[in-house]
UniProtKB/Swiss-Prot annotation:
The keyword Zinc-finger does not apply. Pfam families: Trefoil. Sequence repeats lie at residues 26-33, 34-41, 42-51, 52-59, 60-69, 70-77, 78-87, 88-97, 98-107, 108-115, 116-125, 126-135, 136-145, 146-153, 154-163, 164-173, 174-183, 184-193, 194-203, 204-215, 216-225, 226-235, 236-245, 246-255, 256-265, 266-275, 276-285, 286-293, 294-303, 304-313, 314-321, 322-331, 332-343. InterPro entries: P_trefoil_chordata, P_trefoil_CS, P_trefoil_dom, P_trefoil_dom_sf. It comes from Xenopus laevis. Disulfide bonds join 351-377, 361-376, 371-388, 398-424, 408-423, 418-435. SUPFAM superfamilies: Trefoil (SSF57492). Residues 26-345 have a biased composition (Low complexity). This is Skin secretory protein xP2. Residues 349-392, 396-439 form the P-type domain. The gene is p2. The keyword Nucleotide-binding does not apply. Residues 26-343 are annotated as: 33 X approximate repeats of G-G(0,1)-[EV](0,1)-A-P-[A-P](1,3)-A-E. It is found in: Secreted. GO terms for molecular function: growth factor activity.
Length: 439
């Protein structure tokens, strides 16, 4: 088409040159450019052309060539020529009959849409307008509904989904598409069949972060490489406590089983059962826990008796039935000191004296412990004298004849019990009172 137009214009140019040369040879001055030729002598002047029409050709001149099909008409006399369309672009539509020509688009503005075509969508507020296509390029096609727009020149294209990865499922009708994950983050896992998908964050909001740990608690540790992440707690349940440093995490309960209760504060956690053993059943409410391996079980209370209350933390155990209660510590002070142990036997000062004036308090072969248990003195350092003998206080107060003795105890009373009563004790004479006082 362009080749034909070029040939026609070239032929017209040759004819015009030949015509001008012929006029110059005939001696007739050529009319000025843009001026209509003078009418012949005695002839009527040529009518002026209507507005918007091309002027009639001069007599003998070649008529102005009609524009080719699809080409733009020549501009009116004194009018600005219509801008040529970009190479490869569609020509501007001709104005309707009697209508004003379409104004040229402002510099940098989008071209007017073709007749019958939908106008290009206006850019959103704050967005840059779509760039005009370069000369010789076709305009970029509008993206299909639901597809991402093509990247601008100089920008990196959106990354294609990795090979082996499944494409993201298309959102259901009426739902917003899932946001693309940030660079370096793993895509969110697809919900299991039958489960509701996680709600997408509102536009302009950051994705919901993981729940922060309670005040004073350590954050949940990240799972080690190759381990599965800890399951999220059910709605309304407290998260499982993180294991102490160096301890193994508690095993997850089997499917259908209830998780093991967390130990109370200050208690040791229950030991995990050995591999292959069944876990010990939890004690019923109100029952005592089972004893640890190697410990003796606590004696069960007799039927009808109330179980003994456990002592308070740091408190002293309650006394046995029938025993004397322990002395309570003084108010606000340190606990009362324990009573000094009662020294068995007389004091050392009571055992001094003339060895040859000792009164026998025992029998041949009596041991030191047996002698002191009777409240007597024992001294085996001197040979030939009494080793077990009465102390001086006993000689002064308890050397009574058997007929002067008054019973002060009971059968099989010990020397300690007798001395606590303030009585004398003498078991050296058989058949008389051993614990006595003077009549």
């Amino acid at each position: 088409m362009n080749h034909k137009l070029f040939c026609v214009h070239f032929l017209l140019l040759i004819l015009s040159v030949c015509y001008i040369q012929g006029q110059d040879a005939g001696g007739e001055p050529a009319p000025a450019e843009g001026v209509a030729p003078a009418p012949a002598e005695g002839g009527a002047p040529a009518p002026a052309p209507a507005e918007g029409e091309a002027p009639a050709p001069a007599e003998g001149g070649a008529p102005a060539p009609a524009p080719a099909e699809g080409a733009e008409p020549a501009p009116a006399d004194g009018g600005a020529p219509a801008p040529a369309p970009a190479e490869g672009g569609a020509p501007a539509p001709a104005p309707a009959e009697g209508g004003a020509p379409a104004p040229a688009p402002a510099e940098g503005g989008a071209p007017a849409p073709a007749e019958g075509g939908a106008p290009a969508p206006a850019p959103a507020e704050g967005e840059a307008p779509a760039p005009a296509p370069a000369e010789g390029e076709a305009p970029a096609p509008a993206p299909a509904e639901g597809e991402a727009p093509a990247p601008a020149e100089g920008e990196a294209p959106a990354p294609a989904p990795a090979e082996v990865e499944a494409p993201a499922p298309a959102p259901a009708e009426g739902e917003a598409p899932a946001p693309a994950p940030a660079e370096g983050e793993a895509p969110a896992p697809a919900p299991a069949e039958g489960e509701a998908p996680a709600p997408a964050p509102a536009e302009g909001e950051a994705p919901a972060p993981a729940p922060a740990p309670a005040e004073g608690e350590a954050p949940a540790p990240a799972p080690a490489e190759g381990e599965a992440p800890a399951p999220a707690p059910a709605e309304g349940e407290a998260p499982a406590p993180a294991p102490a440093e160096g301890e193994a995490p508690a095993p997850a309960p089997a499917e259908g089983e209830a998780p093991a209760p967390a130990p109370a504060e200050g208690e040791a956690p229950a030991p995990a059962p050995a591999e292959g053993e069944a876990p010990a059943p939890a004690p019923a409410e109100g029952e005592a826990p089972a004893p640890a391996e190697g410990e003796a079980p606590a004696p069960a209370p007799a039927e009808g008796e109330a179980p003994a209350p456990a002592p308070a933390e740091g408190g002293a155990p309650s006394p046995a039935e029938g025993g004397a209660p322990a002395a309570a510590p003084a108010e606000g002070g340190a606990p009362a000191p324990a009573p000094a142990p009662v020294e068995v036997g007389p004091k050392t000062e009571d055992c001094k004296g003339d060895p040859f004036k000792r009164t026998d308090c025992g029998y041949p072969g009596i041991t030191e412990g047996q002698c002191k248990a009777k409240g007597c003195c024992f001294d085996s350092s001197i040979v030939g004298v009494k080793w077990c003998f009465f102390p001086r206080t006993a000689r002064a107060q308890c050397l009574f004849s058997p007929g002067d003795r008054e019973d002060c105890g009971y059968s099989s009373i010990t020397p300690m019990e007798c001395m606590k009563r303030g009585c004398c004790f003498d078991a050296s004479i058989t058949g008389v009172k051993w614990c006595f006082h003077q009549k």
